[in-house]
Amino acid sequence: MCVKRILSIVLMMLLLFGAADAMAKHGEKPPIKKAILLVAFGTSDPEAAKAFELVEKRARERFPGVEMRWAYTSRMIRYKLAKQGKLLDSPETAFAKLMDDGYTHVAVLSLHTIPGEEFHELYQNAHLFGQMSGGFQKVLVARPLLSSGKDMETVAQVLLKNIPGRKAGDAVVFMGHGTEHHPADAIYLAMNQVFQEIDSNAFVAAVEGNNSLETVIPKLKKRKANKVFLVPLMSVAGDHAKNDMAGDEDDSWKSILTAKGFKVEPILKGTAEHLEIVDIWLEHLKSAFTHF
Protein backbone atom coordinates (compact mmCIF):
# COMPACT_ATOMS: atom_id res chain seq x y z
CA MET A 1 0.00 0.00 0.00
CA CYS A 2 1.49 3.36 -1.01
CA VAL A 3 2.28 6.05 1.55
CA LYS A 4 -0.35 8.45 0.22
CA ARG A 5 -3.01 5.73 0.53
CA ILE A 6 -1.95 5.06 4.13
CA LEU A 7 -2.12 8.77 4.88
CA SER A 8 -5.62 9.02 3.39
CA ILE A 9 -6.87 6.18 5.59
CA VAL A 10 -5.29 7.55 8.77
CA LEU A 11 -6.53 11.09 8.16
CA MET A 12 -10.03 9.77 7.46
CA MET A 13 -9.91 8.16 10.91
CA LEU A 14 -8.81 11.51 12.31
CA LEU A 15 -11.78 13.26 10.73
CA LEU A 16 -14.09 10.68 12.28
CA PHE A 17 -12.63 11.04 15.76
CA GLY A 18 -11.08 14.52 15.73
CA ALA A 19 -13.86 16.50 17.41
CA ALA A 20 -15.78 15.80 20.57
CA ASP A 21 -19.26 17.29 20.38
CA ALA A 22 -21.26 17.27 23.60
CA MET A 23 -24.80 15.99 23.49
CA ALA A 24 -27.51 18.63 23.55
CA LYS A 25 -29.00 19.25 26.97
CA HIS A 26 -32.71 19.26 27.62
CA GLY A 27 -34.45 22.04 29.45
CA GLU A 28 -33.54 25.67 29.91
CA LYS A 29 -29.97 26.52 28.90
CA PRO A 30 -27.78 29.00 30.81
CA PRO A 31 -26.19 31.96 28.98
CA ILE A 32 -23.30 31.00 26.72
CA LYS A 33 -19.92 31.28 28.43
CA LYS A 34 -16.93 30.25 26.28
CA ALA A 35 -13.46 29.04 27.21
CA ILE A 36 -10.39 27.59 25.54
CA LEU A 37 -8.40 24.78 27.14
CA LEU A 38 -4.81 24.48 25.90
CA VAL A 39 -3.58 20.92 26.34
CA ALA A 40 -0.05 19.58 25.94
CA PHE A 41 1.93 16.58 27.12
CA GLY A 42 3.81 19.14 29.18
CA THR A 43 7.38 20.03 30.07
CA SER A 44 9.28 20.78 33.27
CA ASP A 45 12.05 22.56 31.36
CA PRO A 46 11.71 26.36 31.78
CA GLU A 47 13.37 27.05 28.42
CA ALA A 48 11.13 24.60 26.59
CA ALA A 49 8.06 26.02 28.36
CA LYS A 50 8.66 29.35 26.63
CA ALA A 51 7.20 27.75 23.50
CA PHE A 52 3.90 27.29 25.32
CA GLU A 53 4.00 30.95 26.33
CA LEU A 54 4.31 31.82 22.65
CA VAL A 55 1.30 29.64 21.82
CA GLU A 56 -0.82 31.29 24.52
CA LYS A 57 0.22 34.78 23.44
CA ARG A 58 -0.68 34.00 19.84
CA ALA A 59 -3.97 32.41 20.89
CA ARG A 60 -4.96 35.44 22.97
CA GLU A 61 -4.32 37.64 19.95
CA ARG A 62 -6.59 35.46 17.83
CA PHE A 63 -9.30 35.00 20.48
CA PRO A 64 -9.33 38.20 22.57
CA GLY A 65 -11.42 38.17 25.72
CA VAL A 66 -11.88 34.39 25.79
CA GLU A 67 -10.95 32.58 29.02
CA MET A 68 -7.84 30.42 28.50
CA ARG A 69 -6.48 27.70 30.74
CA TRP A 70 -3.76 25.06 30.53
CA ALA A 71 -3.67 21.34 31.20
CA TYR A 72 -0.80 18.82 30.97
CA THR A 73 -1.52 15.19 30.16
CA SER A 74 1.71 13.89 31.75
CA ARG A 75 1.22 12.94 35.40
CA MET A 76 4.98 12.72 35.90
CA ILE A 77 5.54 16.27 34.67
CA ARG A 78 2.64 17.61 36.75
CA TYR A 79 4.14 15.93 39.83
CA LYS A 80 7.60 17.30 39.10
CA LEU A 81 6.23 20.82 38.65
CA ALA A 82 4.14 20.53 41.83
CA LYS A 83 7.33 19.85 43.81
CA GLN A 84 8.59 23.18 42.44
CA GLY A 85 5.40 24.92 43.54
CA LYS A 86 3.89 25.09 40.04
CA LEU A 87 0.45 23.52 39.88
CA LEU A 88 -0.81 22.32 36.50
CA ASP A 89 -4.14 20.56 36.05
CA SER A 90 -4.80 17.36 34.19
CA PRO A 91 -7.35 17.75 31.38
CA GLU A 92 -9.96 16.04 33.55
CA THR A 93 -9.38 18.42 36.47
CA ALA A 94 -9.41 21.38 34.09
CA PHE A 95 -12.73 20.26 32.61
CA ALA A 96 -14.22 19.88 36.09
CA LYS A 97 -13.06 23.37 37.14
CA LEU A 98 -14.43 24.93 33.95
CA MET A 99 -17.74 23.21 34.57
CA ASP A 100 -17.84 24.42 38.18
CA ASP A 101 -17.07 27.95 36.98
CA GLY A 102 -20.11 27.91 34.74
CA TYR A 103 -18.52 27.66 31.31
CA THR A 104 -20.94 26.22 28.76
CA HIS A 105 -18.82 25.96 25.60
CA VAL A 106 -15.21 24.73 25.67
CA ALA A 107 -12.84 24.45 22.72
CA VAL A 108 -9.79 22.29 23.36
CA LEU A 109 -6.53 22.98 21.54
CA SER A 110 -4.44 19.84 21.48
CA LEU A 111 -0.75 20.61 21.05
CA HIS A 112 -0.10 17.01 20.09
CA THR A 113 1.62 16.39 16.76
CA ILE A 114 -0.45 13.42 15.58
CA PRO A 115 -3.85 11.96 16.54
CA GLY A 116 -2.24 9.18 18.55
CA GLU A 117 -3.12 7.45 21.80
CA GLU A 118 -2.90 10.55 24.01
CA PHE A 119 -4.96 12.64 21.61
CA HIS A 120 -7.75 10.07 21.50
CA GLU A 121 -7.74 9.71 25.27
CA LEU A 122 -8.19 13.48 25.46
CA TYR A 123 -11.01 13.27 22.92
CA GLN A 124 -12.78 10.51 24.84
CA ASN A 125 -12.56 12.36 28.15
CA ALA A 126 -13.82 15.58 26.56
CA HIS A 127 -16.74 13.65 25.11
CA LEU A 128 -17.60 12.16 28.51
CA PHE A 129 -17.59 15.59 30.15
CA GLY A 130 -19.75 16.86 27.31
CA GLN A 131 -22.35 14.21 28.07
CA MET A 132 -22.66 14.99 31.77
CA SER A 133 -26.08 16.24 32.78
CA GLY A 134 -26.14 19.89 33.80
CA GLY A 135 -22.62 20.50 32.53
CA PHE A 136 -21.24 21.81 29.27
CA GLN A 137 -23.53 22.47 26.35
CA LYS A 138 -20.72 21.76 23.89
CA VAL A 139 -17.10 20.59 24.01
CA LEU A 140 -15.01 20.45 20.85
CA VAL A 141 -11.47 19.13 20.50
CA ALA A 142 -9.48 20.78 17.71
CA ARG A 143 -7.36 18.62 15.44
CA PRO A 144 -3.66 18.11 16.26
CA LEU A 145 -0.85 19.51 14.12
CA LEU A 146 -0.49 16.97 11.31
CA SER A 147 -4.12 16.63 10.26
CA SER A 148 -3.96 17.07 6.48
CA GLY A 149 -1.56 16.88 3.58
CA LYS A 150 -1.48 20.67 3.46
CA ASP A 151 -0.56 20.86 7.16
CA MET A 152 2.24 18.37 6.64
CA GLU A 153 3.68 20.22 3.66
CA THR A 154 3.60 23.55 5.50
CA VAL A 155 5.30 22.08 8.58
CA ALA A 156 7.99 20.46 6.44
CA GLN A 157 8.71 23.66 4.54
CA VAL A 158 8.88 25.78 7.71
CA LEU A 159 11.23 23.37 9.46
CA LEU A 160 13.53 22.93 6.48
CA LYS A 161 14.04 26.66 6.02
CA ASN A 162 14.96 27.08 9.69
CA ILE A 163 18.14 25.01 9.91
CA PRO A 164 20.97 27.53 10.36
CA GLY A 165 24.32 26.66 8.86
CA ARG A 166 23.08 23.79 6.74
CA LYS A 167 25.03 23.26 3.52
CA ALA A 168 24.32 21.29 0.37
CA GLY A 169 24.70 17.59 1.08
CA ASP A 170 23.98 17.91 4.80
CA ALA A 171 21.18 15.64 5.99
CA VAL A 172 18.43 16.32 8.52
CA VAL A 173 16.69 13.79 10.75
CA PHE A 174 13.52 14.98 12.47
CA MET A 175 12.72 13.23 15.75
CA GLY A 176 9.07 12.40 16.36
CA HIS A 177 7.74 10.86 19.54
CA GLY A 178 6.08 7.92 17.82
CA THR A 179 3.29 5.73 19.12
CA GLU A 180 3.25 1.96 19.42
CA HIS A 181 0.24 -0.16 18.47
CA HIS A 182 -1.71 2.81 17.08
CA PRO A 183 -2.58 3.44 13.41
CA ALA A 184 -1.58 7.11 13.70
CA ASP A 185 2.06 5.98 13.78
CA ALA A 186 1.74 5.72 9.99
CA ILE A 187 1.64 9.52 9.86
CA TYR A 188 5.38 9.58 10.58
CA LEU A 189 5.93 7.39 7.53
CA ALA A 190 3.78 9.76 5.48
CA MET A 191 5.61 12.78 6.90
CA ASN A 192 8.91 11.22 5.90
CA GLN A 193 7.58 10.97 2.36
CA VAL A 194 6.53 14.64 2.43
CA PHE A 195 10.04 15.66 3.50
CA GLN A 196 11.59 13.43 0.84
CA GLU A 197 9.53 15.03 -1.91
CA ILE A 198 10.86 18.44 -0.85
CA ASP A 199 14.41 17.46 0.13
CA SER A 200 15.96 14.04 -0.51
CA ASN A 201 18.31 14.53 2.46
CA ALA A 202 15.51 15.03 5.00
CA PHE A 203 14.16 12.11 7.03
CA VAL A 204 11.76 11.39 9.89
CA ALA A 205 12.35 8.86 12.66
CA ALA A 206 10.65 8.35 16.02
CA VAL A 207 11.56 7.44 19.59
CA GLU A 208 8.75 4.87 19.72
CA GLY A 209 6.89 2.92 17.07
CA ASN A 210 8.05 1.48 13.76
CA ASN A 211 10.03 4.41 12.36
CA SER A 212 13.18 4.07 14.45
CA LEU A 213 16.52 5.79 13.88
CA GLU A 214 17.93 2.43 12.79
CA THR A 215 15.68 2.51 9.71
CA VAL A 216 17.17 5.86 8.67
CA ILE A 217 20.89 5.18 9.17
CA PRO A 218 21.26 3.07 5.98
CA LYS A 219 19.59 5.88 4.01
CA LEU A 220 22.03 8.43 5.46
CA LYS A 221 24.93 6.22 4.38
CA LYS A 222 23.43 5.78 0.92
CA ARG A 223 23.11 9.56 0.57
CA LYS A 224 26.76 9.84 1.72
CA ALA A 225 25.80 12.51 4.22
CA ASN A 226 28.80 14.00 5.98
CA LYS A 227 26.89 16.05 8.53
CA VAL A 228 23.51 15.30 10.09
CA PHE A 229 21.30 17.86 11.78
CA LEU A 230 18.89 16.54 14.41
CA VAL A 231 15.65 18.47 14.88
CA PRO A 232 12.68 17.66 17.14
CA LEU A 233 9.33 17.07 15.42
CA MET A 234 7.67 17.85 18.75
CA SER A 235 5.98 20.94 20.12
CA VAL A 236 8.81 21.65 22.57
CA ALA A 237 12.48 20.75 22.82
CA GLY A 238 12.06 19.05 26.18
CA ASP A 239 13.39 15.83 27.70
CA HIS A 240 13.26 13.74 24.52
CA ALA A 241 15.06 16.39 22.50
CA LYS A 242 17.69 17.22 25.12
CA ASN A 243 18.39 13.67 26.25
CA ASP A 244 17.21 11.06 23.72
CA MET A 245 18.17 13.20 20.73
CA ALA A 246 21.02 15.50 21.78
CA GLY A 247 22.31 13.92 25.00
CA ASP A 248 25.81 12.60 25.66
CA GLU A 249 24.71 9.11 26.72
CA ASP A 250 25.71 6.24 24.43
CA ASP A 251 22.11 5.56 23.38
CA SER A 252 21.25 9.12 22.33
CA TRP A 253 20.71 9.76 18.64
CA LYS A 254 23.67 12.13 18.60
CA SER A 255 25.97 9.50 20.09
CA ILE A 256 24.70 6.71 17.85
CA LEU A 257 25.20 8.74 14.67
CA THR A 258 28.58 10.03 15.85
CA ALA A 259 29.68 6.44 16.43
CA LYS A 260 28.63 5.68 12.84
CA GLY A 261 31.04 8.33 11.59
CA PHE A 262 28.68 11.25 11.01
CA LYS A 263 29.23 14.80 12.19
CA VAL A 264 26.12 15.65 14.20
CA GLU A 265 24.54 18.97 15.14
CA PRO A 266 21.34 18.98 17.22
CA ILE A 267 18.95 21.93 16.99
CA LEU A 268 16.94 22.35 20.18
CA LYS A 269 13.89 24.14 18.84
CA GLY A 270 10.38 22.69 19.03
CA THR A 271 7.66 23.15 16.43
CA ALA A 272 5.70 25.46 18.76
CA GLU A 273 8.57 27.96 18.54
CA HIS A 274 7.72 28.64 14.89
CA LEU A 275 4.85 31.12 14.48
CA GLU A 276 3.89 29.68 11.09
CA ILE A 277 3.41 26.29 12.71
CA VAL A 278 1.60 27.70 15.74
CA ASP A 279 -0.83 29.29 13.30
CA ILE A 280 -1.72 25.84 11.94
CA TRP A 281 -2.81 24.75 15.41
CA LEU A 282 -4.77 27.97 15.82
CA GLU A 283 -6.54 27.46 12.50
CA HIS A 284 -7.65 24.07 13.80
CA LEU A 285 -8.86 25.79 16.98
CA LYS A 286 -10.71 28.38 14.92
CA SER A 287 -12.45 25.60 12.99
CA ALA A 288 -13.72 24.15 16.27
CA PHE A 289 -14.62 27.56 17.70
CA THR A 290 -16.82 28.46 14.72
CA HIS A 291 -19.23 25.68 15.77
CA PHE A 292 -20.15 27.59 18.95
Predicted feature locations:
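Bacterial N-terminal signal peptides
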Residues: 9-18
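Position-driven detector of the extreme protein N-terminus
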Residues: 2, 13-14, 24
